[in-house]
């Protein structure tokens, strides 16, 4: 009960062996993102910045994070390519905290993300 936190951390089992994380990063980078999917991500970013419902939109850097996360999601699903559904699945975690409603209504991030997904057509 009174264990030192460092001792507790030292007793945690290792989940990854040396080099496995690098292998996972490389595998994630190898997941294919097609041109239509890139257009979809760009449309999401553009709508968040230019659409009537948002005061603060998503930056190009947010788009890069969205693509990296969607690649990882696809890899975890056992695929070598990203689907629009992968982008939609990770969008709340990647972008929810970055979006602000234009009318300053304090909407939950999940609702703002839903608005964005509903406003942009799937490829």
Segments from the language model and where they lie:
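C-terminal engagement/docking regions of AAA+ P-loop ATPases
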Residues: 48-123
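Conserved AAA+ ATPase core "coupling" helix
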Residues: 1-43
């Amino acid at each position: 009960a009174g264990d030192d936190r460092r001792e507790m951390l030292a007793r945690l089992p290792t989940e990854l062996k040396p080099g496995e994380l690098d292998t996972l990063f490389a595998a994630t980078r190898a997941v294919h993102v097609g041109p239509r999917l890139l257009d979809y991500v760009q449309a999401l970013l553009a709508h968040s910045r230019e659409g009537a419902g948002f005061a603060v939109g998503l930056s190009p850097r947010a788009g890069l994070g969205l693509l990296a996360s969607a690649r990882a999601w696809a890899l975890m699903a056992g695929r070598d390519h990203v689907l629009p559904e992968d982008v939609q699945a990770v969008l709340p975690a990647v972008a929810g905290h970055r979006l602000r409603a234009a009318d300053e209504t304090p909407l939950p991030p999940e609702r703002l993300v839903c608005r964005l997904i509903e406003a942009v057509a799937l490829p």
